[in-house]
């Protein structure tokens, strides 16, 4: 299975955040905050992979190992999950379900950040689909 890792999602999300920030403000601080927020959202959505892995493996070993060895988890991401613990279709479905809840909830409090969140999550799902289809990020 081809995959895209956190470093790729972070970079793509920061670029999206920069473009969104630049398009609506001249404030360097707000552009920076938007890019940072986008980077965080673009990576944090993948926390659902641990729940999917738990469903397949029957335990939380992937999450426990990442908490025990966080630096290794960032460097050797390909070793976090066992083979076929996180299937592409499940990952995409989970991301769509989370996005469909998170974006409207944020909209209630702040439409601007809801828009940023929605765009970043959309791009996240697109990059996953592209990586799954092409193997470009391997």
Q: Where are the regions a protein language model picked out?
A:
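N-terminal membrane-targeting hydrophobic helices
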Residues: 1-138
């Amino acid at each position: 299975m081809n995959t895209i890792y956190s470093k790729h999602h972070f970079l793509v999300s920061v670029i999206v955040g920069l473009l969104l920030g630049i398009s609506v403000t001249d404030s360097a601080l707000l552009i920076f905050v938007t890019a940072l927020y986008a980077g965080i959202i673009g990576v944090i959505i993948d926390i659902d992979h641990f729940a999917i892995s738990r469903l397949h493996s029957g335990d939380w070993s992937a999450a426990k190992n990442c908490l025990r060895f966080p630096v290794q988890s960032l460097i050797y991401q390909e070793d976090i999950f066992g083979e076929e613990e996180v299937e592409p279709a499940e990952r995409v479905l989970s991301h769509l379900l989370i996005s469909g809840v998170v974006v409207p909830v944020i909209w209630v409090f702040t439409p601007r950040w809801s828009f940023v969140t929605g765009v970043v999550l959309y791009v996240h799902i697109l990059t996953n689909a592209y990586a799954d289809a092409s193997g470009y990020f391997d």
